[in-house]
Regions:
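Extreme N-terminus nucleophile/cap motif
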Residues: 1-64
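Alpha/propeptide regions of enzymes that mature by internal proteolysis
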Residues: 9, 58-65, 76-96, 111, ...
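Short, well-ordered loop/turn elements at secondary-structure boundaries
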Residues: 13-16, 27, 77-80, 121-122
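Cysteine protease catalytic core and zymogen-processing segment of caspase-like enzymes
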Residues: 68
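Active-site-proximal, acidic helix/loop segment immediately C-terminal to a metal-coordinating Asp/Glu
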Residues: 92-106
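Conserved small/polar residues in nucleotide/adenosyl-binding loops
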Residues: 123-129
Length: 129
């Protein structure tokens, strides 16, 4: 499915966190586009920083950091010929399972099965009337 990501994002007041994966027309190269945006001051206080083997989020101004729990994480980690991209600290869990070959053929699923999840929040859901 082809989408013009520029038009989509330009028309969206709050795109939140996003991950786009794609490949070159010849299928030989892959790309990842990742963006972050926040509603709260704490969530907006982060930027990407390159690290060995990936990209992580860090506080733009450490003095303004309130709660790092949901905003500071490895966003991208590369393991041999595999790249793990997520929008939270589950990147580390998946990378650990895949790197250790803990469940051959099922590492991704097995890693996520170890996680707990927040309850669904409908505070931003607008239902039709």
């Amino acid at each position: 499915m082809k989408k013009n990501i520029y038009k989509y994002l330009a028309g969206n007041d709050y795109p939140g966190r996003g991950i786009v994966l794609g490949k070159s027309p010849d299928g030989q190269k892959a790309f990842v586009a990742y963006w972050i945006m926040g509603r709260s001051a704490n969530s907006r206080n982060r930027v990407f920083e390159p690290i060995d083997g990936g990209i992580r989020t860090v506080a733009a101004d450490p003095a303004k950091l309130e709660d790092p729990h949901l905003i500071i994480y490895n966003a991208v980690l590369t393991l041999r010929e595999t790249t793990v991209v997520t929008n939270g600290d589950q990147t580390d869990t998946i990378a650990r399972f895949m790197n250790g070959n803990l469940f051959p053929g099922y590492s991704f699923e097995a890693a996520l099965a170890t996680r707990t999840y927040e309850a669904v929040s409908y505070t931003h859901l607008t239902l039709p009337t």
